[in-house]
């Protein structure tokens, strides 16, 4: 099996920049020589997800309305990693902010690129076992 080769970036233009989403149009040349004059890339911040399990074995999930999907759904506690935070620091902060839970034994579960064909960010997932409600 051949090792994939990088594409050559010929030009890049930002279409818009917002704190939560930036879009750019790249002009690239593939290893075969074929050029793609409009390859769109979305730049999102990295985020973290938390699989949080209580001492009694219950998983902490939450319901939130998500406008892009037009519905209320269940999801894991999650959020954007702020500047200067490590992924673990962000995960601990997000779990507490969104659910009021904390403590427990934390471990890194995985880091993935959620949509590497068009997005440049990473999602860091943590497993927190033995979480409990935290008082202020």
Locate the predicted segments by residue.
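Basic/polar N-terminal segments that are highly enriched at the extreme N-terminus
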Residues: 1-6
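Acidic, metal-coordinating catalytic segment for phosphate/diphosphate chemistry
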Residues: 7, 11-49, 55
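Residue-level structural signal for beta-strand termini and adjacent loop
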Residues: 40-41, 65, 114
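Conserved hydrophobic/aromatic beta-strand scaffold that supports enzyme active sites
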Residues: 23-27, 61, 125-127
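A glycine-rich, hydrophobic loop/mini-helix early in the fold
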Residues: 44-75
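Unchanged
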Residues: 37, 47-49, 54, 79-136
């Amino acid at each position: 099996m051949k090792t994939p080769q990088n594409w050559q970036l010929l030009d890049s233009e930002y279409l818009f920049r917002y704190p939560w989403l930036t879009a750019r149009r790249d002009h690239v040349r593939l290893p075969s020589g074929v050029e793609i004059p409009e390859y769109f890339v979305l730049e999102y911040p990295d985020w973290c997800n938390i699989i949080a399990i209580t001492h009694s074995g219950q998983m902490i999930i939450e319901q939130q309305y998500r406008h892009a999907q037009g519905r209320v759904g269940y999801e894991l506690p999650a959020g954007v990693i702020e500047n200067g935070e490590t992924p673990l620091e962000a995960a601990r902060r997000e779990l507490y902010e969104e659910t009021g839970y904390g403590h427990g034994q934390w471990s890194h579960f995985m880091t993935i690129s959620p949509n590497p064909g068009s997005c440049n960010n990473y999602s860091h997932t943590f497993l927190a076992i033995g979480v409990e409600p935290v008082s202020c």
